[in-house]
């Protein structure tokens, strides 16, 4: 990490911007892939059980839309993975043995599984048995879900690094337990929350397209039956997303308390802390954490944050100042202040430098063991050694605060939406002209994407300044590049990904507008 002494700070900013750009675009495609896979799998299952041509054609319609989206997700995902080697080479060197393992499994197992069965799903109609085709459809969705699992395992490890040990001889973190990495509680919660929220995206998409048909007085049976299925999927996934989100909040409170404090704009913690519902935060104000007060127009749910973070009404939740100044936990353990962690981090860096210098001269020097022991004690704070000002440890509060509320607010709205549209679809005649409901469904489509992206903004920006929590700050992970080169590729990716997004929207709109049920699909 010696290049940190000369690296241009703008390289860090451009590299972060490029990764954010590609990740946001990629995530426009992934949740729809996971969500549509469930809906079209259910529809084809009904066809398998009934043998009615209508269900066959319904499955094929949704599979066409799935195929377009699936292709775009693969294209944008490959570019995203390559960025670790180009823009974040120091990160790849430092933890490549660990981070690369789940991505390798994802590529070998999940991606090959998807590639194989997606071909059967699209081209196997009338060429393979109904049962084998149905299995291929479900296995395509399962492959995409397994792919998401391994990618989320890698991301969860960045949030909560486990199953590894630092080797001072190679200056790398090495995996000591694949099971700890793959089955991390943080990874499990992240996976289920991400997948269930993706099912939500798929359900909203199906409802929106179906309501467009009803608004145009077309394909009524396809629209009605699709809404019935999507409403159930959406209602179940809404409840599951809320439940898994609660589990994730508890994990964040334990492992990333600064992220939670930023999400709540909580400067001074305590017991029985309220959950802020509405507040006004000035995004342009220079933060003064020691003197920060509750934001104006502050409306909070009494003891709500303590309940969310600790599952206790009187649970203790630390604020920004508590985390910067150090505090005593309810169990009596003292948490170090930011300055103490930074000092131990600098000591770890100094011990590592001395260890490598001595080892280069004499690999049998008895002092090496002493330095290795000292380094192991200070290694949990290694990343803090690169922090110059404790204010750097606080994520940007306004964007985390509002993004979290957008995610939760839209999620709650979607739950109500699925209750209403499900009731109308199953208990009433939804094909009877209900313009207000059709327009509401169309409005929900952009909202669910905003909520989905907002969740990832909280997950990633709330972790800053860390690339790997407490272990490696973002500025230490970047490659030593010219800022102009990174800026150029940023705009190239912006153009490329925008073209891909426009292409997907145009192709999907073409498929939807020109779809006409064949005469054989009346039964």
Where are the model-predicted features located?
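Internal alpha-helical transmembrane segments
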Residues: 119-127, 132-141, 149-157, 178, ...
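Hydrophobic alpha-helical transmembrane segments
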Residues: 30-39, 109-117, 198-209, 406-422, ...
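Membrane-interfacial loop-to-helix junctions in multi-pass inner-membrane proteins
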Residues: 50-68, 94-100, 104, 124-142, ...
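Hydrophobic alpha-helical membrane-insertion segments
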Residues: 67-76, 138-161, 234-245, 441-459
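Aromatic-rich transmembrane-lumenal/periplasmic boundary elements in polytopic membrane proteins
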Residues: 154, 236-347
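Membrane-interface interhelical loops and short amphipathic "cap" helices
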Residues: 1-24, 51-58, 82-104, 156-192, ...
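Membrane-interface helix-loop-helix modules in multi-pass inner-membrane proteins
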Residues: 69-139, 156, 461-465
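C-terminal substrate/ligand-recognition segments
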Residues: 388, 392-456, 487-511
